[in-house]
Amino acid sequence: MFEIKKICCIGAGYVGGPTCSVIAHMCPEIRVTVVDVNESRINAWNSPTLPIYEPGLKEVVESCRGKNLFFSTNIDDAIKEADLVFISVNTPTKTYGMGKGRAADLKYIEACARRIVQNSNGYKIVTEKSTVPVRAAESIRRIFDANTKPNLNLQVLSNPEFLAEGTAIKDLKNPDRVLIGGDETPEGQRAVQALCAVYEHWVPREKILTTNTWSSELSKLAANAFLAQRISSINSISALCEATGADVEEVATAIGMDQRIGNKFLKASVGFGGSCFQKDVLNLVYLCEALNLPEVARYWQQVIDMNDYQRRRFASRIIDSLFNTVTDKKIAILGFAFKKDTGDTRESSSIYISKYLMDEGAHLHIYDPKVPREQIVVDLSHPGVSEDDQVSRLVTISKDPYEACDGAHAVVICTEWDMFKELDYERIHKKMLKPAFIFDGRRVLDGLHNELQTIGFQIETIGKKVSSKRIPYAPSGEIPKFSLQDPPNKKPKV
């Protein structure tokens, strides 16, 4: 069996960096080199301050960096020396041309394939780590075949990641499963077994699943679509709970005890975010349309539509409760990352909520323990603009949650950081304008509602009626309409 002794990973982001750090940590005899064109990112990986925050990552990196784990911008040499090359580059949703707003943009995958074949000789395994549309491996294979040379043998595998940001190291060390897809040929199966041997250093063999390449690629898209679907499903029930007096947490507990359903991903919130869910579901929608499956495409599109609705609905409740206007009012936004225990803001619901409120003229004071000011400014600015006038005028980045809440009309919790449960809310209430509102978009304050109401707060949360006095936002109850793909930069229609 072919033995993998040197690994190259192209892409030092949220997937490539942690994944290869754990491989190096678990396989001290394998030399792992993570490469990227971004020199500042590589410098950060080689410094005490890593470019991404992930619990446990720093300890893993420091245990093997400089021994069998290396970070470099020398991509060509790393490819030449490697027995296995992971492709772990970004596959964003296309923002132009055919498939705009839905299809995956594979330009970085194509660039990697061309660079790999240019710098390879002999036998080498090339493995997709990035989330890609079905049959992306076939496209890579066609590039390899069109640029073949004597004695070159490149085998293409699919090995999608299933880690969750915030628990990535735990997920990598103790995965539910490892999925490897390859060609159903002797050469393809030889490559599959070689990669299996790497994971078998710490993963039980029964947890390593092998399939054909297409099943592996589709399994990743389907897994993210199913998880997103569950969140949208419970969020749809949260709207019903608010209208009827039911509590979505109690409903989720009741249905989650059914073993056929289970209790995972039944946490109602202001909406899902992150780099994967929306991108992958939209990719699935586009794939279904391209394969002439319009009914299937419409089904999965509803998952995204419900997520968009949940965000708009929450923004509407804020405006509704604050006497139909937030113009020139100070609102504290607690949390900007898309989830706790990460600094990743991609598709964060906090971005959407902030933009909705900014378009109503609200002054936002934003605090997040792990997201730097520069990232918040970029996320709230128009594309291609370093910092637009609206952001300069309406957004302040606070150094701590108490500063953000000082003099605020309302506190809006958008990320479920544990620290928000431990704040001195009596201190916060004293410094806020009255009536003082808390809008808990993540239900992190469940169990504290009576205490907070005793202090004097008006509480609004997802999927439960807490405060009873509310002023209708509009006689019709209509929710402002915003474009799904283009967060609002215009006044809502009411």
UniProtKB/Swiss-Prot annotation:
Positions with a binding annotation for NAD(+):
11-16, 36, 41, 89-93, 130-132, 165, 276-279, 346
Q: Please give the SUPFAM superfamilies that the UniProt record associates with this protein.
A: 6-phosphogluconate dehydrogenase C-terminal domain-like, NAD(P)-binding Rossmann-fold domains, UDP-glucose/GDP-mannose dehydrogenase C-terminal domain
Q: Region (Allosteric switch region) spans which residues?
A: 129-135
Summarizing the annotation, the consequence of altering I116T is: In DEE84; uncertain significance
What is stated about the way this protein's activity is regulated? Answer: UDP-alpha-D-xylose (UDX) acts as a feedback inhibitor. It binds at the same site as the substrate, but functions as allosteric inhibitor by triggering a conformation change that disrupts the active hexameric ring structure and gives rise to an inactive, horseshoe-shaped hexamer.
Q: What is the effect of changing A104G?
A: Impairs protein folding. Decreases affinity for UDP-glucose. No effect on inhibition by UDP-xylose. No effect on hysteresis and cooperativity
Q: In which tissues is it expressed?
A: Detected in heart, placenta, liver, pancreas, spleen, thymus, prostate, ovary, small intestine and colon. Widely expressed.
Modified residue Phosphoserine is at which positions?
Answer: S476
Q: What is its EC number?
A: 1.1.1.22
Q: Which pathway features in its UniProt record?
A: Nucleotide-sugar biosynthesis; UDP-alpha-D-glucuronate biosynthesis; UDP-alpha-D-glucuronate from UDP-alpha-D-glucose: step 1/1
Give yes or no: UniProt keyword Repeat.
no
Result, substituting P175A: In DEE84; uncertain significance
- pH-activity relationship: Optimum pH is 8.6.
Q: Name one GO biological process term.
A: glycosaminoglycan biosynthetic process
Sorted UniProt keywords: Acetylation, Allosteric enzyme, Carbohydrate metabolism, Disease variant, Epilepsy, NAD, Oxidoreductase, Phosphoprotein
**Documented effect of changing E161Q:** Abolishes hydrolysis of the covalent intermediate between substrate and the catalytic cysteine residue
Q: What are the positions of the active site? A: E161, K220, C276
Instruction: Spell out the coiled coil positions from the record.
Output: none
Q: What does this protein do?
A: Catalyzes the formation of UDP-alpha-D-glucuronate, a constituent of complex glycosaminoglycans. Required for the biosynthesis of chondroitin sulfate and heparan sulfate. Required for embryonic development via its role in the biosynthesis of glycosaminoglycans. Required for proper brain and neuronal development.
Q: How does it assemble?
A: Homohexamer.
Query: Protein name, please?
Result: UDP-glucose 6-dehydrogenase
Per UniProt, what is the name of the gene that codes for the protein in this document?
UGDH
